[in-house]
């Protein structure tokens, strides 16, 4: 069963992509949806089996890398964190597949689209279920490639190609640092397996853990669109709306958050990394929600809303509330997917127009879409008893409940971000459905609700957006919940704040976000309905023009990057190419050698002037040249021969001298021994005579 969860989306992708002509358009849609729906059912079964029974499953397929000091296995694990991530990934994916049947019904390349969607789901499952950092990185790169393919699906659009390239290159920055972090893990621990790395984490130098954590955080910043590496996410809205719902709301953008949660046994031992996460999430929340307030494209507003909620998740990670972070991740996937699919239904109804200012009065034509977008928006602003309320407010309470200077400041900053979230949510609902009609007559003549393929996913996600948070809050954030006792996440005992959050936060600070949400919702509706002239008059002033332009142009971050980073790198690359590739390398190499030969041949050919005396001079010079060469060679060889002969003679003389010395020594030794022997004999005779 567990292996089927991994394999089925890949089979669906292969059939739709390589055999699309054989099975046809309808066949590719049916097979793609069936494979994902079957996988979703199996994932729900695994959620109950693994999560509630605390029975982690491990699957070893085969060895990938095998050396003396480093072994890597294709190993997949299903623990409580994995099955929790599989639920939003596969539920949203199956609903998006079903939704795409109606949304992409008139597209001539729907087989390719369904193949890309199934391949993305497969790569996301690899990322979530991998049992080591290298296998996780395979899925990490896979979802990046699939995102590139899906954003540029309509490749005849220049904006789509630019957006996909921007997403691809921006994520390369994060991937580079993630790779560096993996190298540091391998250098310091000798392994990339989760169990080995996490079991040795308490015994490593904190500075090394900080370096690893910062590298992992930068990788997560790019994938989860945090401030600094966020520019690709709003541009990625050029892709089809189902792609935005699947990739850029529910699954791929949460991969960075998942990476940090999975690495909790590592980063818990570095307070520096946690503090950076805390402030990074706070800045991202306010930054993105403030930009979203000044956007006019409905999909870009929802994209900046996604970025803001990802900042909330990073705040929870900085507070060491990993269970709250994963809970908010799952809740956010459902209501943000609903927002994107609802926006897709609106865009589909008004002939692909995405400008809010050309909507208005659509509540009469799209009552179901209005209802589901209202439900999703209420969940987004954490209205009481909606799904988002149980996780988003708990993050804010956790920030105040830690009782540190940084966390209390982050509480107020994130609350301001929540207020801006309320404002642009009301803006979307009001300008789209409640305001006076501002669009073309053709919009309203042709506006209609979608078919069953567009409507059913909206209803299902609306049910999730209402009830899922209430039904699962005790599983993820309840006191004494044993859902994560299989050590899939780790919270250091010194940083455990669940009880402080539940019982130590004053009631006023628990209710403050709710009161601000209600107050600013009413204020914004009154403002738009009864005082629109004030907004127009302010925008027409110089101050209003500059303020609106600054926020509408996203704090001029893209302008800064293009002017000071992109242009600098391009100039540096151009100069490098000019000096090295086009310069020294080619001058030393074939280009310069060819030019030298051509010039030499022209010089030689220019010597033929037809003057006899010049020719005689050339002959004389040539003869002298050849004579000098031969003379040098003869002298050189004579000198060499003389040296060789002298060396031979010297060696022979030395050899003879050594031999003569040896013979003389031998003769002297023989004479001495004979003389001594004869004297000994005579002495013995004389001694004998005396004795007689």
Curated annotation (Swiss-Prot):
Location, primary (coarse class): mitochondrion
Residue ranges of the TM segments: 5-23, 30-52, 81-103, 112-129, 133-155, 168-190, 200-222, 243-262, 272-294, 301-319, 329-351, 364-386, 409-431, 452-471, 511-528, 535-557, 615-637
GO BP of this protein: ATP synthesis coupled electron transport; electron transport coupled proton transport
A GO term for molecular function: NADH dehydrogenase (ubiquinone) activity
Transmembrane is among the record's keywords: yes
The encoding gene: nd5
Membrane topology: Multi-pass membrane protein
Function: Core subunit of the mitochondrial membrane respiratory chain NADH dehydrogenase (Complex I) that is believed to belong to the minimal assembly required for catalysis. Complex I functions in the transfer of electrons from NADH to the respiratory chain. The immediate electron acceptor for the enzyme is believed to be ubiquinone.
Catalytic activity: a ubiquinone + NADH + 5 H(+)(in) = a ubiquinol + NAD(+) + 4 H(+)(out)
Protein name as catalogued: NADH-ubiquinone oxidoreductase chain 5
Organism for this UniProt entry: Hypocrea jecorina (Trichoderma reesei)
Family to which the UniProt record says this protein belongs: Belongs to the complex I subunit 5 family.
Top EC class, one word: translocase
Gene3D superfamilies assigned to the protein according to its UniProt record, in alphabetical order: 1.20.5.2700
Lineage top rank: taxon: Eukaryota
Record's keyword terms, sorted: Electron transport, Membrane, Mitochondrion, Mitochondrion inner membrane, NAD, Respiratory chain, Translocase, Transmembrane, Transmembrane helix, Transport, Ubiquinone
